[in-house]
């Protein structure tokens, strides 16, 4: 009990205590090397403690309760892993200018991101969510350029709108529940007289972070200007906080809401396909990846809609969404870190580099025997025709296939613009190490990380041989479309 409490407490205390290193300018180099250490207690908690671990803090705010369940464990492992590998990468990536300022905002954002995942009471959850959001502004504007400041203003404006909506929704839900615990909110929201208003506020507020269509504007502006390690955690971990907010507050499993389900499936489809349409028109690698994140979160929004529409499948869909979050976060973190890698001098080294860049991208598209294939097969098994009875249900398999084609088109576009932007040179050892760990996490370690117990059997490697064609054809279709587009442009 003491060890588990200590780990949960250290997960937050260590990043906050590291701020003491910012008191003296001559400690900033030591602070840089501490960045990879800060998420270690959280990672150990996620890997060792497992569901059921909890820590009561009666003197904190209105009474704090931090802990893990199956869903939070997956989110915590992903979040801590991404911040760790990005921290390793940052040691080699960061320059001397504004180093201390970067480390301060990094530690504050990390504490908020880890805290909101573990928080089980409303006050802690919202406090950590707000800390992550507003400290993240410092990472977005770190470079201080005109473009960064513009992105920061848009980010801050959208953040304020989102936080106001979240706080209003949480207060209304808490009043209805008569409780300060997140676990009591779904049932209370389901029975509330103003359920539609509470749900709208929570969907919109968390939707800002999750990149919901029409609330996504900050994403393609912030990612290109933020330092590369910050972009990796913005897209790989922080954007998932919006999804987690939905999953722990909305009335999943309490009442079937087919109208809300239909609306979210449509919004998810718009995000998935619209993000791809806008993304393939971009010319900067990180901007393409930002739109790819919007597209991928569209698939998550689609699944949220399906879970709201049918109480019976809410639990299994939670497990599949958690698996998809783990896959997408690791792959996207690797891709973002790769944008800062210089090409080695030798041809063999360049081929190896491009292979390791391409594989996480192909995983996003569902290449067999990758984490993406596991996630997509699990989704396909649940969203097959006949499982759901709301209006948009018959279109779910088609939308998933279209999303897979859209993802592969974005992967090809990313590789094309990354090839044009790449330059030769040497990379610091810590950059190689951080990017290598992120890539290994996506391609290899994913299979040994904690998975939710309710993940369908189809997600396992043994089934991928029989499902190879269903995984391959979207990749082949997107490749054919990309080849035709390239040929058309070349002939002009």
Segments predicted by a language model, with ranges:
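Interfacial loop-to-helix junctions that mark the boundaries of transmembrane helices
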Residues: 1-6, 63-72, 123, 185-193, ...
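Transmembrane helix-loop-helix hairpins at membrane boundaries of multipass inner-membrane proteins
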Residues: 1-104, 181-184, 217, 492
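Alpha-helical transmembrane segments of polytopic membrane proteins
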Residues: 4-11, 72-77, 261-265, 324, ...
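Hydrophobic core of alpha-helical transmembrane segments in multi-pass integral membrane proteins
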Residues: 10-23, 35-51, 80-87, 170, ...
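Membrane-interfacial helical/loop segments at transmembrane boundaries in membrane proteins
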Residues: 56-61, 185-187, 378-389, 448-469
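Hydrophobic transmembrane alpha-helices and their helix-loop junctions in integral membrane proteins
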Residues: 85-95, 100, 108-125, 135-427
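Cytoplasmic/organellar membrane-interface segments at the starts of transmembrane helices
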Residues: 350-352, 411-492
């Amino acid at each position: 009990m003491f060890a588990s409490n200590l780990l949960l407490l250290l997960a937050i205390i260590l990043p906050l205590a590291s701020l003491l290193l910012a008191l003296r300018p001559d400690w900033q180099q030591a602070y840089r090397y501490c960045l990879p250490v800060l998420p270690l207690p959280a990672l150990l908690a996620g890997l060792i403690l497992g569901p059921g671990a909890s820590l009561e803090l009666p003197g904190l705010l209105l009474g704090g309760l931090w802990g893990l369940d199956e869903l939070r464990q997956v989110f915590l492992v992903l979040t801590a892993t991404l911040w760790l590998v990005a921290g390793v990468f940052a040691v080699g990536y960061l320059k001397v200018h504004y180093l201390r300022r970067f480390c301060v905002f990094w530690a504050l954002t990390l504490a908020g991101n880890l805290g909101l995942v573990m928080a089980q009471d409303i006050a802690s959850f919202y406090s950590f969510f707000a800390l992550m959001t507003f400290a993240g502004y410092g990472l977005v504007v770190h470079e201080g350029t005109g473009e960064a400041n513009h992105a920061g203003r848009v980010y801050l404006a959208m953040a304020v709108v989102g936080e106001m909506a979240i706080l209003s929704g949480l207060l209304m839900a808490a009043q209805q529940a008569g409780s300060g615990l997140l676990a009591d909110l779904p049932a209370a929201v389901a029975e509330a007289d103003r359920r539609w208003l509470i749900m709208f506020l929570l969907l919109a507020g968390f939707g800002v972070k999750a990149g919901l269509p029409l609330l996504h504007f900050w994403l393609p502006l912030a990612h290109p200007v933020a330092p590369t390690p910050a972009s990796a955690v913005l897209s790989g971990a922080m954007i998932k906080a919006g999804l987690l907010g939905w999953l722990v507050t909305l009335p999943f499993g309490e009442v079937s809401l087919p109208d809300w389900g239909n609306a979210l499936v449509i919004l998810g489809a718009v995000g998935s396909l619209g993000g791809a349409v806008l993304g393939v028109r971009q010319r900067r690698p990180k901007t393409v990846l930002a739109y790819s994140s919007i597209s991928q979160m569209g698939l998550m929004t689609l699944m949220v809609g399906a879970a709201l529409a049918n109480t019976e499948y809410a639990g299994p869909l939670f497990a599949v969404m958690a698996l998809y979050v783990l896959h997408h976060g690791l792959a996207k973190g690797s891709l973002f870190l790769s944008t800062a890698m210089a090409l080695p001098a030798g041809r063999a080294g360049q081929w190896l580099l491009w292979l390791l860049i391409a594989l996480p991208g192909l995983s996003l598209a569902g290449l067999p025997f990758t984490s993406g294939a596991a996630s997509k097969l699990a989704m396909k098994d649940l969203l097959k025709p006949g499982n759901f009875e709301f209006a948009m249900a018959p279109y779910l398999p088609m939308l998933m296939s279209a999303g897979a084609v859209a993802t592969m088109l974005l992967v090809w576009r990313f590789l094309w613009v990354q090839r044009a932007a790449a330059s030769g040179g040497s990379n610091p050892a810590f950059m190689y190490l951080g990017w290598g760990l992120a890539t290994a996490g996506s391609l290899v370690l994913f299979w040994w990380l904690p998975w939710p117990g309710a993940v369908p059997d189809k997600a396992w490697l043994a089934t991928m041989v029989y499902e190879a064609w269903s995984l391959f054809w979207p990749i082949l279709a997107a490749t054919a479309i990309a080849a035709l587009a390239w040929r058309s442009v070349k002939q002009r």
